[in-house]
A protein has these predicted regions:
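Conserved donor-nucleotide/metal-binding helix-loop-beta segment in metal-dependent transferases, i.e.
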Residues: 48-71
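Domain-level recognition of soluble alpha/beta enzyme cores
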Residues: 87-89
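Conserved alpha/beta core of the MobA/IspD/sugar-nucleotide pyrophosphorylase nucleotidyltransferase superfamily
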Residues: 91-94, 98-140
Length: 140
């Protein structure tokens, strides 16, 4: 209901086949709806800044990757939406970069401070709370 009020279109995943498959499903749906670009931001980012998001969206590369501190993919912009296979998992930013290279695409890697911290474990949360003190108030 909240999404509908904000004009967000929800794309339901028909099967629970993992993150990469879910994003591929959404990419295909986005392309069918006429979208030329897709921005993927996982929900576990600690504190993404609007300025970093804006910088990432201004990239004119067909593939823009924002790696996490452990080389995962914390944000990905692709144009068209299905330009590369999605390879989420351990060190996925390197996998996405490799997929772009296989297709002859010069991908852009953007190391944006607010996109480096995700919350995968209690250790990640503790680190994020030290680096971004405002998170502590939200988590209390």
């Amino acid at each position: 209901d909240i999404a509908k009020k904000l004009g967000v279109r929800v794309i339901h995943e028909p099967n629970n086949l993992g993150l990469s498959a879910a994003i591929l499903h959404s990419a295909i749906a986005a392309k069918e709806m006429g979208f030329e670009r897709l921005c993927i931001i996982p929900a576990d980012l600690a504190a993404p800044l609007r300025s970093d998001l804006s910088a990432m969206l201004k990239s004119d590369s067909a593939v823009t990757i924002c790696p996490s501190s452990d080389l995962g993919t914390n944000a990905l912009v692709v144009s068209p939406p299905d330009i590369i296979p999605f390879r989420y998992g351990s060190r996925s930013s390197l996998s996405h970069l490799q997929e772009a290279k296989k297709k002859g695409i010069n991908a852009r890697v953007m190391k944006l401070d607010s996109f480096t911290f995700d919350i995968d474990t209690n250790k990640c949360l503790a680190r994020a709370m030290r680096v971004v003190p405002d998170i502590a108030g939200v988590c209390a």
